[in-house]
Amino acid sequence: HLGIARRATNGIELRVHPTLIPAEELIANVNGVKNAVLVQAHAVGPTLYYGAGAGAGPTASAVVADVIDIVRDISYTEDGAGTIPQLAFEALTNVPILSREEMTTGYYIRINAEDQTGVLADVTTILSRAGISIDAIMQQPRLKDLIPIVILTDPVVESKMDEALAQIQALPVIHGEIVRIRLESLDN
């Protein structure tokens, strides 16, 4: 899973989910019980912080840190405008946290379809009408009686992808659930 916190033009994206990232990214090589935090900064570019993320020691440390954060949060006010406990200052502006439907990302889509003329055209037409740009598309070899279709999209607002996939799923030539995995390029 990848946890993402990003400032968008209309708010803050906060999300955790399975994510495909480029293999050449340093964070793609974090394995096992290790965790990493990738920070994109204007002055220095990307910086990576890497270390233990699971097991008795790291888990206990995280629990203690959470308890300390709760105890320190004595500056919380009734109107919900508390200060940041560790830094003891107030936010300069209120920036909304975006809903899942408002977030923007690319997608890996895998569809199992009947091997019929026009299926690919129907799928790409639905994506096009939703304003979804296709980055790459590949039709896999036949698997039993179905043809797997793999599509990578350019970044799109999730609500548009939800609507398009519902329309594609409703096509009578589509079998099984459509697989959707979010993509991140990590370049912004």
Which residues are covered by each model-predicted region?
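A conserved regulatory-domain signal marking ACT and ACT-like small-molecule sensing domains
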Residues: 62, 67-188
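Short, glycine-/Ser/Thr-/acidic-enriched flexible segments
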Residues: 7, 19-23, 42-45, 53-56, ...
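Substrate-binding/catalytic subdomain of NAD(P)-dependent oxidoreductase enzymes
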Residues: 1-29, 34-36, 55
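Gly/His-enriched, cation/cofactor- and phosphate-binding structural elements
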Residues: 28-72
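Structured core elements
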Residues: 1, 15, 38, 48-50, ...
